[in-house]
Amino acid sequence: MSQGFKTEADVMRNTAHRVDDTNQEVSAELSRLRSIVDGVRASWEGTAQVSFDNLMQRWDASAKGLQDALQSISDNIRGNATSFENVEADNQSAFSAVGGQGLAL
């Protein structure tokens, strides 16, 4: 028998924080690589340099896309944690409203 899906809001927020950390690490590494690559730009001339510049524009767009995707994942996880807490609070209120009267069946 399946145990189902279980989670807690604090676990979700911790996961979102880990995604943020990963995003920062990826950003730092991409910046480091970009600095290295920028150092060889001067070795290209003419149409080769134009091609190189076009390639680097695509690199920048892809890097931003990756960073945006990681940020979106983190934001979604945080939003889900808040929704999870709200549903839990609503459920608790609903059960408390029944109180000692039991269910009218």
Curated annotation (Swiss-Prot):
Signal sequence, renumbered to the chain: none
| InterPro entries per UniProt | ESAT-6-like_sf, T7SS_ESAT-6-like
Q: List the disulfide bonds.
A: none
Disordered: annotated segments: 1-23
Under the heading Pfam families, the entry gives: WXG100
The UniProt regions of compositional bias labelled Basic and acidic residues, in chain numbering, are: 7-21
> Could you describe the subunit structure of this protein?
Forms a tight 1:1 complex with EsxB.
Instruction: Name the family the entry cites.
Output: Belongs to the WXG100 family. CFP-10 subfamily.
Matching entries from NCBIfam families are given as: WXG100_ESAT6
Q: Note on file?
A: To improve expression in E.coli the proteins were cloned as a single protein in the order esxB-esxA with a cleavable thrombin tag.
Can you say what this protein is called? ESAT-6-like protein EsxB
Organism, by scientific name, is: Corynebacterium diphtheriae (strain ATCC 700971 / NCTC 13129 / Biotype gravis)
